[in-house]
Amino acid sequence: MSELLSVALFLASVLIYAWKAGRNTWWFAATLTVLGLFVILNITLYASDYFTGDGINDAVLYTLTNSLTGAGVGKYILPGIGIALALVAVFGALGWILRRRRHHPHHVGYSLLALLLALGSVDASPAFRQITELVKSQMRDGDPDFAVYYKEPAKTIPHPKLNLVYIYGESLERTYFDNDAFPNLTPELGALKNEGLDFSHTMQLPGTDYTIAGMVASQCGIPLFAPFEGNASASVSSFFPQNICLGDILKNSGYQNYFVQGANLRFAGKDVFLKSHGFDHLYGAEELKTVVADPSYRNDWGFYDDTVLDEAWKKFEALSRSGQRFSLFTLTVDTHHPDGFISRTCNRKRYDYDGKPNQSFSAVSCSQENIAEFINKIKASPWFKDTVIVVSSDHLAMNNTAWKYLNKQDRNNLFFILRGDKPQQETLAVKRNTMDNGATVLDILGGDNFIGLGRSSLSGQSLSEVFLNVKEKVLAMKPDIIRLWNFPKEIKDFTVDRDKNMIAFSGSHFRLPLLLRVSDKRVEPLPESEYSAPLRFQLADFAPRDNFVWIDRCYKMAQLWAPALALSTDWCVSQGQLGGQQTVQHVDKAQWQGKTAFKDTMIDMERYKGNVDTLKIVDNDIRYKADSFIFNVAGAPEEVKQFSGISRPESWGRWSNAQLGDEVKIEYKAPLPKKFDLVITAKAFGDNANRPIPVRVGNEEQTLVLGHDVSTITLHFNNPTDANTLVIAPPAPVSTNEGNILGHSPRKLGIGMVEIKVVNVEG
C-alpha cells in the first residue's frame, strides 16, 4: 500500500510542478533533488532485491558504506550497468519534464505543494522506511527485552540416546515444496517431509538471511550481527565466544561432532564458528579433495552435492558402526544462486516452468533427489532407530532464476524432522523462525527447550509468536547481540604473529590481513574476505582524521608511504590518519610487538586526497621500480605500459588466464632491445606441461617448455623491428577452479609465472 501511495505522490509532484509551478531556479533545484532522491531510493531497493531477494537489509547497508571493488560480483556487472544507465535516463527525463513550462510565471503555492508531495513520496517509500529502520538499529543502545528473552541452556543433555544428522539445504526453502505452485519439483524429498514433523511457518529474520548467519541462528539461537560484514567472519579467531550453542552442548554430552560440505570451510568463517562451538571434525573442499573419487568433479563453489552426500553417508556408516555417540552436519551447495548447478548422477536434470527450462528449478529438483537418496540410505540402515534426521534450509533463496516465481507465494524456510526412535507424521503451523531450530532439536535429544533467543517449537513459544513486529524487535536487539562478541574497546599494545598470520590485542585475536578504525572507546575491525573490498579500498573510505591501524602485505601500502618495500610480501604495519601523518613498520620478527601512536596533527586535505586516490588505484595500474616483472605482487614494473591475459597475484606468482585473454601480452613503453635474453621463471598447468609454448617478440618466435614444477628458462631474441610487446601463448588452457576465489567462474589456466626478466645483450 505504501508503495502505491509513494508512487502516486511522486507523480502528483511531477505533474503539479511541470504544469503549474512556472520558472524558478531554487524551487526547480529543490524539487528535482527530492524527486531524484525518490528515484535513487527505489533503484537502490530494486538493485538490493536483485542481490539479496530481501530488499535493503543489513548486508546492503554494509556494502553501501564500503567499496565493492574486489567483490565477487562478476555475474552482476551487466545488471549493474543497466541500473546505472536507467538512473541517468530517469534523471534526464525528470529534469526535462519539470522544465517543460519554465517560461511561465513562477507560482509559490504550486511550487511548495509540489515539494511537499515530493517529500511525502520519499517518506512513504518502502526503501526509505527500510533504510531508516536499519540506521536506527545502528544507533540504538539495545532493547530491554533482550535480557528477558535471551536464555542460556544447560551445557549438557542428561541422558543422550540419539545420534543426530542435520542437513542444511542451500537456499532450499519450503516454498519449493508447494506442489500446486511447482508441480513435481520435489517429489522424493517432499515425500520424506510428509512422513515427519513438518514445521510449515519458519520465517526469516534479519541477521539470518545468508549461510553463515542461518547456521549461527539455528545452532546458537541468535542472529549474526557483528561489527563487520557477516561473510567477513573468517578473520576472527573465535565466534560468539561467550555463547552456549548446540554444538557445545553435544560435545559436552559425549558427542563427536562432524561437519561436511563441498565448499571451502574458511569462507565466511564457518571453520572458526564450528571449531568455536564443539566441532572437532571438519571436511570441506580442501579436506575432501584427497579422498573423493574424482577431485576434478567440481562446480564454482566446490564439490557437487552427490559427492558431498556420498562422503556424508560413508561418515554416517563408519560412525554408526563404531558405536560412539555422534552428530553429523552437512551443507549442500548445488542450489546456490544465481543459477545453481546440476550434479551428474541425479535423474532430474531439467525442470521446465512457463514452458521453458529453468536452471534454478532444475538445480533444486536435482539436489532434493540427492538429499532424499542420502536420507533413504540412513532409513534403510539398522542404525536409523537411534537417529534423528533434520532437514532445513540455511536461508530463503536469494535472487535466482526462480525468485520471481517464489515471490508470488507465501515464503517460508524449510524445517522438518524424521525420528527413527519415534516416527511422527504431523504438519505444525506454529509461527516460528530459524533461531528456534536448534532449541527444537535439543528438546528432542533430551536437553533444554531453549537456546539464546530460540525456543523449541514442540514445548516453547517462539519470539515470532510473542511479537507481531518480530523483525523490528530483533533489529532493536542488535547492539545487545553485538556485545556478545566481547570485542575490545581499545588498542594500545599489540602482537603480530608472523608465522600464524595473526594479530592479538586486548585479549582478542584476528587473522591477517586486518584494518582497524580506532576511536574513543571503540575499535572497529574491518577484515578482508572474498566478498568484501580489499583493505586499501576500505581504508580509502575513512575520514581524514580517522585513526587507523592497517596490517597487510608490505607491497600493498608501499606505494603510498614506503617505496623501498614495494616488492616485499612480508607483513607490515601502518598507522596514522589519511589526512595527517602515517608510519609503516616492517614486521621483522616471529613475534612482533607494536604500540599505537596516533598524533593529533594538522589535517592536510591535499595529502588526504592524494592518499585516497593512490589507495584506489586498481592492481593492474600499479607500477614499481624493478629490473624484472615480479608476479607475486600487484602491478608491474615502471617500464610496462599495460598487460593482459594474467590472473591476480598469489603467494607464489600469477597464472595466465585465457578467460582474460587468449595470450599473455606484456606491452612495454619503449621498444625492447635489439638483442636480449628473456629469462622466464615459471611452471605449467595441466596439459600445458612438457609441450612447446610459443613466445613471440615482433616477427621472431621461440618455444618454451615447462614442467609442473617451477623452473627458469632463458630464451635468446633478436628484435630488428623494435617491437615492444612480449606474447606468450599457452597451447592448452585448462578450465579449472584450482586456487579460485569461491563462487567465481572457473579460470582457464596455462602457465604460472613467477618472474620475467629482459636482459639487454646488445654489443
Swiss-Prot record:
Catalytic activity: a phosphatidylglycerol + a membrane-derived-oligosaccharide D-glucose = a 1,2-diacyl-sn-glycerol + a membrane-derived-oligosaccharide 6-(glycerophospho)-D-glucose
InterPro entries, sorted: Alkaline_phosphatase_core_sf (IPR017850), DUF7024 (IPR054288), OpgB (IPR020881), OpgB/LTA_synthase_biosynth (IPR050448), Sulfatase_N (IPR000917)
Pathway(s) per entry: Glycan metabolism; osmoregulated periplasmic glucan (OPG) biosynthesis
Location (main, coarse): membrane
Pfam families per UniProt: DUF7024 (PF22895), Sulfatase (PF00884)
GO aspect biological process, one term: glucan biosynthetic process
Residues annotated as signal peptide: none
Enzyme class: transferase
Entry-linked Gene3D superfamilies: Alkaline Phosphatase, subunit A
Biological role stated in the UniProt entry: Transfers a phosphoglycerol residue from phosphatidylglycerol to the membrane-bound nascent glucan backbones.
Name listed for the protein in its UniProt record: Phosphoglycerol transferase I
Native source organism of the sequence: Salmonella agona (strain SL483)
